[in-house]
Regions:
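Conserved, mostly hydrophobic/aromatic
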Residues: 55
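Surface-exposed cleft-lining segments at the edges of enzyme active sites
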Residues: 201-213
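Conserved, well-structured core domains of diverse proteins
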Residues: 1-37, 71-76, 80-200, 204
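N-terminal alpha-helical transmembrane segments of multi-pass membrane transport
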Residues: 44-45
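Short, acidic/polar
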Residues: 62-69
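Conserved small/polar residues in nucleotide/adenosyl-binding loops
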Residues: 216-218
């Protein structure tokens, strides 16, 4: 396992999802894919939610492909990896920074990506998860939720980098990555069987409307 997390380009992300599911019926090696029961929808914080089950923030919710894998495994409430003003080698601590007595997917610092990189990655994941939900009939594309997570002190949260991250996920419509992802999908409609231009244009720019504050970090 490599010790540096490298985001996947959006076109590669989408093509990997389409090719793998159509040939193997899996998504990023998740074979036991969960299809939601559409009769058991609920509402949380003003948005639809097919299941209250999901994943907490961690290295498994930092890269877009891992977020898609979480959704494929049944997660419908996804707490995105915590963002802070310091990241990577700037933290000055060894990896991994969390004890794993048995085994775990944890080879990262408490923040591997810069706030802007994290925002871009989560927006790519937002589009990709919407697409796999619709294209493969895994559930209602409007019934899963992303939850922002920031820390670890007020001074860091108020910095321009983290503030821009918060604003970008609250309304991504003017971000470059949102526009690029949307345009890529519109330009490649031939790749899809169940996704059309109307669906792509309906994908909301308000990625997150809830937030988790991470205030304790040991």
């Amino acid at each position: 396992m490599r010790d540096i997390m490298v985001p996947m380009s959006f076109d590669k992300l989408i093509n990997q999802c389409l090719t793998e599911y159509r040939t193997k019926k899996s998504l990023f090696d998740v074979k036991a894919i969960v299809t939601a029961d559409t009769e058991k929808n609920m509402e949380f914080c003003g948005r639809g939610l097919e299941s209250p089950l999901g994943v907490a923030a961690g290295p498994h919710t930092q890269l877009a492909q891992n977020i898609v894998a979480c959704y494929a495994g049944g997660a419908r409430f996804i707490e995105l990896k915590t963002v802070q003003v310091m990241y990577g080698e700037e933290l000055g601590i060894q990896k991994p920074c969390i004890r794993a007595n048995d085994e775990g997917y944890n080879v990262e610092w408490s923040s591997e990506l810069h706030a802007l990189e994290a925002m871009n990655e989560y927006i790519r994941a937002w589009f990709a998860t919407k697409i796999v939900a619709k294209e493969f009939g895994l559930g209602n594309p409007d019934a899963f939720q992303f939850n922002m997570s920031v820390g670890y002190n007020l001074e860091g949260i108020k910095t321009p980098a983290v503030d821009s991250f918060l604003n970008g996920l609250n309304d991504a419509s003017t971000t470059k990555v949102f526009q690029e992802c949307k345009q890529y999908l519109l330009d490649n409609l031939h790749l899809f069987e169940n996704v059309d231009a109307d669906f792509i244009n309906s994908i909301p720019a308000h990625v997150c409307n809830t937030i988790t504050l991470s205030l304790i970090h040991i």
